[in-house]
Amino acid sequence: SQIIPNRGAWLEYETDSNDIIWVRLDRARKLCLTALLRALGYETDDDIRNLLGNDKRLEATMAKDATVAEASKDRGGAVRTLREQALLIIYKKQKPDEPESVESATNMFKSLFYDPKRYDVMRVGRYKFNKKLSIATRINKHIIAEDIIDPRTGEVMFRAGQVIDLETARR
């Protein structure tokens, strides 16, 4: 399947014969879906299972994901979170010839998905995306990690620490 925004990075999802779920950003080299999810903030396997449920394809994808192994490598005392390591993996796939750093990887990822000038799924696309993935029911009773700010107005829509109910999720 594909997510093709009005502006911004295309996301293409595919599975292989081993039931591993892959994603391509802007038709670049493929990476494990779980690496993308870890970069989005779902760092642990349990976080991902809570988001998507238990599925043999998801388990196969988590087993293939190199993020955990890479994050645990010794770097002379520098400890990386799973999110940071996932960001670096995505950065290496998108820009293989450039030197990597957590800061540059974070900036690239934010510009790919969080900059309203560069990424826009539009209202209809957002509706279809949320409906197909049942986002409202999946995030029900979760806690908001960071303030959610309306990119057009700068208004804080939801505060960090707030518990999401179905009414909030549908907004």
What does each model-identified segment do?
Residues 1-171:
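N-terminal non-catalytic structural scaffold regions of very large proteins
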